[in-house]
A protein has these predicted regions:
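Membrane-embedded beta-strands of outer-membrane beta-barrel proteins
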Residues: 138-140, 343
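Transmembrane beta-barrel architecture of outer-membrane proteins
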Residues: 133-135, 181, 226, 293, ...
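Bacterial Sec-pathway N-terminal export signals of envelope proteins
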Residues: 32-116, 218, 256-300, 311, ...
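Amphipathic alpha-helical coiled-coil segments
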Residues: 92-107, 171, 175-195, 205-207, ...
Length: 438
């Protein structure tokens, strides 16, 4: 009984260690973070967010190659590495990151000349001979100054890249945690099955002894009957544990992309054993917080862009037109190929209130993004505090269970001696002490 309780407590503590490790899982990542990341919640401002764009790095310590085949004994590190390098959720997140990275090039392209060509076909009363004169047109538009329209679009796209990078880390973190948690469940049920088998074997020995004593007239038939009932109960518990073990093995195999998982090693990395001992959470190592910061930077860039849209855009507009016949205006004095270039200043005067509404929407989105940053930081700290409290409680419980186990083993030996040699202890006491409690 005490071994079972100790094993169950150990399994819960084991699982909690993985949860705590998830909070600090990417401590070794190279994260280029500025000082404004360490601002308190009350100091988060739109201006501060716009000053620097911090991109979380996806490069870190090199991991061991992922296993291509199912090993005979799977460790937690091997399982996590295999899941990270195989899982489709991570591949999906990386694909979205590459897509967003291309959006940065799309935004930067507006800094360069925009060249277009085409053909005009139409009638005009300024043309002779029925007013028809088709022409080829080549035009170039080069933005000279736009009050931050393009630059804010670039910052918005770069913030989107930062957010997708953080989302990749979130996906990796989630897959790693879920895989490790499933493996810990397998470890726990492997131990429970082993203990249940030992318990069943011990009860069967007691049953053989009870039947022998009954045959010799030293004990009643009820002792053997009670033992048989306990044996069947132990078989039921063993069957339940084995079913749960098979279920968690199947779950783990799904995370790893394998048809099955054989034996799981009971070893646990020492580096994760004290993961909950961090004094405080570091925002630069928490993917969810990084994603919230990037979202706030993107919202700030969109607000700047909305304001810039209400200001003029100055551009250089050269154009070449080549007419295909002589019916164009002033064809007697002008060559078929005509050139023009002008500096264009354009700004919206009235758009039905749409631009003002867009600016207000961007401002509200920025307010929501700032709140999301605070929420992500608060949630991370809350999870760490809860995990630390549970870790301390389970560590104390493990120590108590270890003492109970030692006392229980001594008591069991004493009860067996009193039953077998002195006859002063009833068999029911021996059975109760050997009973498995779930």
């Amino acid at each position: 009984m005490d071994r079972m309780q100790s094993s169950a407590t150990y399994r819960r503590s084991f699982k909690l260690s993985v949860l705590c490790a998830g909070i600090a899982f990417f401590t070794t990542s190279s994260l280029a973070a500025g000082s404004d990341l360490m601002q308190s919640a009350s100091q988060i401002t739109a201006t501060g967010l716009a000053k620097q764009q911090d991109l979380p790095s996806l490069t870190g310590e090199s991991a061991e190659p992922a296993l291509a085949r199912v090993p005979d004994s799977l460790t937690i590190n091997q399982a996590v590495q295999r899941a990270i390098q195989w899982h489709p959720d991570i591949a999906e997140a990386v694909g979205k990151l590459l897509e967003q990275a291309d959006q940065v090039d799309v935004a930067k392209a507006k800094y360069y000349p925009q060249i277009s060509g085409g053909m005009n076909n139409g009638y005009s009363n300024s043309y002779s001979e029925k007013g028809y004169s088709p022409s080829f047109v080549l035009s170039v538009s080069q933005m000279l100054y736009d009050f931050g329209k393009v630059s804010s679009s670039v910052r918005s796209a770069e913030a989107g890249v930062a957010q997708q990078q953080a989302n990749v880390l979130v996906s990796i973190d989630t897959v790693a945690h879920d895989t490790a948690a499933a493996l810990v469940q397998v470890q726990g049920y492997q131990q429970l099955v082993k203990i249940a088998q030992e318990q069943l074997s011990a009860l069967m020995k007691i049953g053989d002894l009870a039947r022998q004593r009954n045959n010799e007239g030293a004990a009643s038939l009820s002792d053997a009957t009670q033992t048989d009932a306990r044996i069947e109960g132990a078989r039921t518990v063993l069957t339940q544990y084995q079913a749960n073990l098979d279920r968690w093995r199947a779950t783990l195999a799904t995370y790893l992309g394998w048809p099955l998982v054989k034996k799981v090693s009971d070893d646990f990395p020492a580096s994760l054993a004290r993961s909950c001992d961090a004094a405080k959470s570091d925002d630069r190592t928490i993917p969810a917080v990084l994603a919230a910061w990037a979202q706030a930077n993107e919202a700030q860039a969109k607000l700047d862009n909305a304001n810039a849209q209400m200001l003029p855009t100055i551009s250089l507009e050269p154009q070449v037109t080549h007419y295909l016949n002589n019916h164009y205006a002033s064809s007697e004095t002008l060559d078929r190929t005509q050139y023009s270039a002008w500096v264009k200043v354009e700004m919206p005067l009235y758009q039905g209130g749409g631009m003002t509404a867009s600016r207000n929407a961007a401002a509200n989105a920025l307010t929501a993004a700032n709140a999301a940053v605070n929420s992500a930081r608060l949630k991370a700290r809350q999870q760490l505090n809860e995990s630390q409290s549970q870790s301390q409680s389970l560590a104390l419980s493990l120590a108590i269970q270890a003492r109970q186990q030692r006392l229980g083993e001594k008591t069991q030996e004493l009860y067996q001696d009193q039953y077998l040699q002195l006859g002063t202890r009833p068999l029911l006491d021996v059975l109760n002490l050997s009973l498995i409690h779930i």
